[in-house]
């Protein structure tokens, strides 16, 4: 055999071996790809693979578990894993889920949002120091906490009134603004139910009289703006049921008498100008009179601006049953004796006569009775 034939046979043998090995290698690659469905040679969850159908471990920045894997694979892989913690945009975490850039609760919504809110409460808006819960401008507390200026149920009067945390000293209920008292405390101008008068009048009168500003109640009640009683109008303003108690303590020392402007007391002294039913008179008259200047039973409203009887109009104004008693300690003599400065001027039944008149036309029981009854610098039985 020649040398040329040997070369041909050797070349054919080498070529067959080379092509056989090449075919085997290429076939293996194709088979592997068709079996695992992956260009990277990854199997089920094999390490180093990025986002198979069942969530392998991420190959990119964060490797970490589930970086875009799971059902959100594909786009979630790579960078989403490392930074996102819980996964990529499509995974459990990411910007939208529990993890994301913020981790933990994170900025993400969904379930992560809820948990984040709770923890964020505390010092924040959820309550505590921040307001929200206990406080709030409209709540029981207020911006500053405690009771505060907050409105709503219990602000001032109402249920909060009784206890009077805001009362007495402050303004709240009970003794405060909304309750028996007024703006300044004990009595005063306070509005609302029992503001001065009404139910609050009774008790308010006794204690709040003499010393305090408002007497029995507030502007509408037994007490008034100035002294023991005051100007308070309305039913029971000074007089009425509240008069009795209010008169006693408030009468003696204080300015006002049994009631307010419409009641036993007046602007200045024991009784006053008050007209209307029971103005100075009534049950409250007795206590309000005596020392304070008003007559025994309130002589025509307890008296006028100055003394015992006075200008009081309406039933029993000036004279009447209170005429005689109007003398008493404060009547009879002096400018205000028996009547007020305008004593006897009052019209109606039982009109007082003259200045300081002790005796009046149509005088009731005790007419002309008292220390100065029947005397005084004024004389005559003539009224103007």
Curated annotation (Swiss-Prot):
GO terms for biological process: cell wall organization. It comes from Petunia hybrida. One of its GO terms (cellular component) is extracellular region. Responsible for plasticity of the cell wall. This protein contains 67% glycine residues. It is found in: Secreted, Cell wall. Residues 1-27 form the signal peptide. Keywords: Cell wall, Cell wall biogenesis/degradation, Repeat, Secreted, Signal. This is Glycine-rich cell wall structural protein 1.
